[in-house]
A protein has these predicted regions:
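Hydrophobic targeting segments
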Residues: 3-6, 35, 49-51
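Short glycine-enriched, charge-decorated loop/helix-capping segments at active-site entrances
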Residues: 18-26
Length: 103
């Protein structure tokens, strides 16, 4: 099995650099739209499982609706999410792991 993992931060923290131009709701909507695009690119490749790791329930709901595997993460730095996915992939004896940012 090969895994592509998509870490996505909590929507309340998404796209903060755009705060001068976009409201918190607009930034969250943008982050979800970008996740949808990344999921479009990652899902459906034979031999690859797509995982989404996030502390945000809304993100995980979008991922589950798209039939990606969801991995609930305790909110923290990106490195923590990647280490969590690395451990899970190793437990499943994955032959490859690709990390693709959710945005």
């Amino acid at each position: 099995m090969r895994i592509v993992a998509i870490p996505v931060k909590a929507l309340g923290r998404a796209k903060r650099r755009l705060a001068p131009a976009l409201s918190p709701l607009e930034r969250a909507a943008l982050a979800l739209a970008m996740l949808e695009d990344v999921l479009d690119a990652c899902l459906g490749h034979p031999g690859w499982e797509t995982w989404v790791v996030s502390p945000d329930e809304a993100v995980l709901e979008v991922a589950a609706a798209r039939r990606a595997r969801v991995v609930a993460e305790e909110e923290g730095p990106l490195g923590r999410a990647i280490r969590q996915v690395e451990r899970l992939a190793a437990e499943r004896e994955a032959e490859a792991l690709a990390i693709v940012p959710g945005d």
